[in-house]
């Protein structure tokens, strides 16, 4: 009998928690524009490119603490991010051309 009462107590606590969660007003979501996200992505690509360039310059000048594998990793990250940016651009251009060719 006490086990059933214990389960009922847990159920009532869960129901109270669910009711209080429903009573809370949802947090307003920040407005995120497509142009803003695109600009942020381009900034990240630019930052990756700049980081790779700086690492390569440091390695070329022989600064201590800059290993070849770090330079190569940064260069590959920059290359992959640039290729991704190019592919996104290509898809956006194709989508734009498709929308513009639609008849209204």
Curated annotation (Swiss-Prot):
Q: Pfam families attached here?
A: FliE
Q: Which GO terms describe its molecular function?
A: cytoskeletal motor activity; structural molecule activity
Picking any one GO biological process from the record gives: bacterial-type flagellum-dependent cell motility
**What are the subcellular locations of this protein?**
Bacterial flagellum basal body
What main location does UniProt list? other
Q: Which domain of life is it from?
A: Bacteria
Q: Which UniProt keywords apply?
A: Bacterial flagellum
A cellular component annotation (GO) from this entry: bacterial-type flagellum basal body
Q: Which NCBIfam families match?
A: fliE (TIGR00205)
Q: What's the family?
A: Belongs to the FliE family.
- HAMAP family for this protein: FliE
Record protein name field: Flagellar hook-basal body complex protein FliE
What organism, scientifically named, is this protein from? Escherichia fergusonii (strain ATCC 35469 / DSM 13698 / CCUG 18766 / IAM 14443 / JCM 21226 / LMG 7866 / NBRC 102419 / NCTC 12128 / CDC 0568-73)
What is this organism's lineage?
A: Bacteria, Pseudomonadati, Pseudomonadota, Gammaproteobacteria, Enterobacterales
